[in-house]
Amino acid sequence: MTVGVLQLELSIPSAFSLKDKRQVVKSLKDRIGHAHNVSVAEVGALDEHRRSIVAVAMVSNDKRYVEGALSKLVDYVRLDPEAVLQDYQIELL
């Protein structure tokens, strides 16, 4: 069994309040979760309106599948017009 964790550090330049940020983050979390069958949560920078840290988790019996799927998720997030990907980390357990 392989557990993959992807941590995304995002910048949200269009957010002028926490409400604006939450709309962008919720939309991104919903799209990621529904399209890729993963668990998604905002885990950091909760009180900063222009920054967010989002974690994505996935479990599979195939290590290569998890690594590939999380890499594709990084590419998917890079295409988001409202959230700018600043950094990411993939960890396989």
Predicted regions mapped to residue ranges:
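A generic structural signal for short beta-strands and their flanking turns/coil linkers
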Residues: 2-6, 34-36, 50-54, 84-86
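Short, charge-patterned binding micro-sites
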Residues: 3, 41-62, 91
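Short glycine-/aliphatic-rich beta-strand segments at the starts of folded cytosolic domains
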Residues: 4-13, 18
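Amphipathic alpha-helical assembly/interaction segments
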Residues: 17, 27, 31-33, 37-44, ...
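C-terminal binding/interaction regions
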Residues: 21
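C-terminal structural segments of small proteins and small subunits
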Residues: 58-93
